[in-house]
């Protein structure tokens, strides 16, 4: 199995995606091709030996082979024309805009390329935090109370303090603020609106229990990772959140009851099946008074949440083997031929 790891793109989380790709170089024990999408949305084939931070920060990637996306795959530009890149399955690890909003999924679907990652509908619903909450509630998964603010509308925050403000279409803890009283609200709104015209406001619950669970469906069976309890802090900032997954070491499993473990898995399955088939996702949950609440869905989790799996490569291989392309629609122009036959040419 040869994987084409797609990363980068024009996103606030561009650099995080590069870190994810570098980690996958270490932990995915399979043949890999690294496909970098730069800020101008040009594709480059990066030699595995050059998969390091300097290649991208210095702009040296521009000296690598350029790729074009066409029906059936990526193609390398050569002096004699184009040569198809040897790749069986693409892996979408573009974080944020372009990768998690459905654009990459749409391209890969359109050009008939097998890929691991959320499909278009799953991307749209999980990229927008407000839509995520509506989706979760529709499948019987609880969420915290929330309100959506829009940059172009005058709206009051009806939730009591403290509350938390999050840009609706951004991950990685970027633009997030905890607001403890009215005096901090305007600044927090200004920060969040710098990144998105829609902002989700939630009640902030201190000393809350948080658990992370990753998984995917292989055939008709759900495969789950261990359950992680992140280290406690009011909120993980950008560096805390992503320096953690930049390491390839495993994490310890949360010390929780079998009953709670099953509750988390049940809620994960409701979120995942069938919308996220073909993707390996991570869900972050809150637990309050033994009740499970969805915090967020990570459709392309950092480094594919490899650190949560005992045998990460085996999970990815089995997921890839079960991915099917969309069925092609038969187009034979029978209708047009029938019109031409009866009434002359159109």
Swiss-Prot record:
Cell compartments where the protein resides: Cytoplasm
Predominant location: cytoplasm
Protein name, per record: D-alanine--D-alanine ligase
Reactions it catalyzes: 2 D-alanine + ATP = D-alanyl-D-alanine + ADP + phosphate + H(+)
Binding residues annotated for Mg(2+) 2, in chain numbering: 296, 298
Entry keyword set: ATP-binding, Cell shape, Cell wall biogenesis/degradation, Cytoplasm, Ligase, Magnesium, Manganese, Metal-binding, Nucleotide-binding, Peptidoglycan synthesis
Functional note: Cell wall formation.
GO biological process, alphabetically ordered: cell wall organization; peptidoglycan biosynthetic process; regulation of cell shape
Organism whose genome encodes this protein: Campylobacter lari (strain RM2100 / D67 / ATCC BAA-1060)
Cofactor note text: Binds 2 magnesium or manganese ions per subunit.
Catalytic activity, EC: 6.3.2.4
Gene Ontology terms, MF aspect: ATP binding; D-alanine-D-alanine ligase activity; metal ion binding
Family to which the UniProt record says this protein belongs: Belongs to the D-alanine--D-alanine ligase family.
Binding site for ATP: 159-211
Disulfide bonds: none
InterPro entries associated with the record: ATP-grasp (IPR011761), ATP_grasp_subdomain_1 (IPR013815), D-Ala_lig_Van_CS (IPR000291), D_ala_D_ala (IPR005905), Dala_Dala_lig_C (IPR011095), Dala_Dala_lig_N (IPR011127), PreATP-grasp_dom_sf (IPR016185)
Amino-acid positions noted as binding Mg(2+) 1 in the UniProt annotation, renumbered to this chain: 284, 296
Any single GO CC term annotated in Swiss-Prot or TrEMBL for this entry: cytoplasm
